[in-house]
Amino acid sequence: MRPTPQRRAVATGALVAVTAMLAVGVQTTSANAGQDKAAHPAPRQSIHKPDPGAEPVKLTPSQRAELIRDANATKAETAKNLGLGAKEKLVVKDVVKDKNGTLHTRYERTYDGLPVLGGDLVVDATRSGQVKTAAKATKQRIAVASTTPSLAASAAEKDAVKAARAKGSKAGKADKAPRKVVWAAKGTPVLAYETVVGGVQDDGTPSQLHVITDAKTGKKLFEFQGVKQGTGNSQHSGQVQIGTTKSGSSYQMNDTTRGGHKTYNLNHGSSGTGTLFTDSDDVWGNGTNSDPATAGVDAHYGAQLTWDYYKNVHGRNGIRGDGVGAYSRVHYGNNYVNAFWDDSCFCMTYGDGNGIPLTSIDVAAHEMTHGVTSATANLTYSGESGGLNEATSDMMATAVEFWANNPADPGDYLIGEKININGDGTPLRYMDKPSKDGASKDAWYSGLGGIDVHYSSGPANHWFYLASEGSGPKDIGGVHYDSPTSDGLPVTGVGRDNAAKIWFKALTERMQSNTDYKGARDATLWAAGELFGVNSDTYNNVANAWAAINVGPRASSGVSVTSPGDQTSIVNQAVSLQIKATGSTSGALTYSATGLPAGLSINASTGLISGTPTTTGTSNVTVTVKDSAGKTGSTSFKWTVNTTGGGSVFENTTQVAIPDAGAAVTSPIVVTRSGNGPSALKVDVNITHTYRGDLTIDLVAPNGKTWRLKNSDAWDSAADVSETYTVDASSVSANGTWKLKVQDVYSGDSGTIDKWRLTF
């Protein structure tokens, strides 16, 4: 079996009662505040409701655990179905279940017992376990010549420490001995060491620098930071309800209704857990810095809102989806102007800044989202994936801030607008035009992965704004925005709620550790297609938002016609060519063509060009397709008709059926030429098939010599084969019967060899 595209699943999430108490010193609203709609409406652009079946189920921890057990029980069979090597093993990381029955299982991989960095993948399957599609961080076959390193671990550690010290760490050695891994995130997989060096970065943030070193050559292959940094808003926001627990005669800042999330006071320390906040009367803080509990309430409340947002909007029960809460630490260091998420402690940490602690709604949402990203796609915190990691936290922080609907801190597309980090009242980041901060980028360019992740996040933040609200000037919630596009064309927004759902689905069900901007576009279009339909208004507007930041093309708003490429035929030999087109509206398409070679015509209803060319020469052909709304699309190509017998082109246009998971079939061409074949024999192949990854394709010479033109690929779910292959046929005689041999090796689909051609 191999992946066969389809969809999702159902369960119910248990809702728990909220034990809340009144606290003084932070925002005015309930933790269960609804979506901001009346106060801060998004412009009515093109906002549609998603397909509820494609949305995730609210799984309880026990339901999620059962799905993970099921995945573990079948992971060996899954690995076999995916065609993994004998030394490759799957490790279940997470399972997401959609309301229509599809299961999305996220795996990591090992090779001969070693972790494979960049080997993660997501497999979509039916409720019964039938694999449908899969998305992999790497398409390379995982294999290394040996798992015995040439380089000593001590040498790798020495180089890693040197790299960390160059970034401000004072550490003299690694946190622990380097571990052997297979590095597969970029290029050909190699045996490597991963070394983690601790210490403190230049700004006081803890460091966990991961350095990847080639275990044979000693070359540094990659490095990334394990501690994710972020920012937030003011602590002064009115009264709120927070979740606490009574213990004896006092109360603890321990929210047992949200996985036991606790908030601690570091009291200006920089290590350890700190002291759990307690209070005698369950009234916390006084709204100023004079009471350490004020910052604690802000952080606790922000974590509470973020938990509720993920659960109520996206069906995720906690950061890892297992119902277990993280914890928060406030008053880190002395005047530390930042906040961070740390996987090693499963916690958020907040500094006091320059008199304004970084402990409010959007900073909590930003940091907690780093945890969600780590538990799902685990976007590597470096290069383009690192920028996407940061942008994910900014997007979800913005979504949470709007969802909270707090009048003291209304939602906006500004990051850090109240902490005054710049000292002049300006925000830290702008989503409508990121370059306004002086460092972030508005659009993708080839060098984007080489800058700081907080600035390479700019284009993705810009995409989120454009996808949510659209381009151009507008006022939202009292804030003026004016969002440009890199191609100068307008973008229509799909609504903030829809944009957030699309990104979250892409993050949790499609993206992998090394996803770049192109991969993020692909993932969000997949998610938009699942939720709203491929070629829907929402799908096309999501694509246009990506085009507006220089990632991918604009979506067609009319008819899209696939170019068949230039054609070559033989005079007096029957041919056929199927033109493929899609429209953005329902209804039939109408086909017409100009410039066809004499003897050929096009079927106006089906788009099939057929006939027998009667005259040699080259024609310029244009095919035009019209939909029921009168919109048109076209494609142009050349069609050359050659003479037959002893010529350079030989073709077979007789269709041959390809049975599903059956025996190989062949299509012959009789070549009448003297001498041997050329060193660059061209083989043009046109096959109709709904899942081309099923197919192996071989060319067989008259003497039996065989060339493999195409291997099967369980991950290649695209339809049809229309390719030109080149082989060195200089060692075989050209004269005789050549064969195209095709076999469907996986069950689920069948197809047809439409035609193939040899050009000598």
UniProtKB/Swiss-Prot annotation:
Residues 32-59, 228-265 are annotated as: Disordered. GO terms for biological process: carbohydrate metabolic process; proteolysis. Residues 228-257 have a biased composition (Polar residues). Its cofactor is Zn(2+). The keyword Metal-binding applies. GO terms for molecular function: calcium ion binding; metalloendopeptidase activity; serine-type endopeptidase activity. Residues 1-33 form the signal peptide. Residues 34-229 form a propeptide. SUPFAM superfamilies: Cadherin-like, Galactose-binding domain-like, Metalloproteases ('zincins'), catalytic domain. Residues 640-760 form the P/Homo B domain. It is found in: Secreted. Zn(2+) binds at residues 366, 370, 390. One of its GO terms (cellular component) is extracellular region. Its EC number is 3.4.-.-. The active site is at residues 367, 454. PANTHER family: BACILLOLYSIN. This is Transglutaminase-activating metalloprotease.
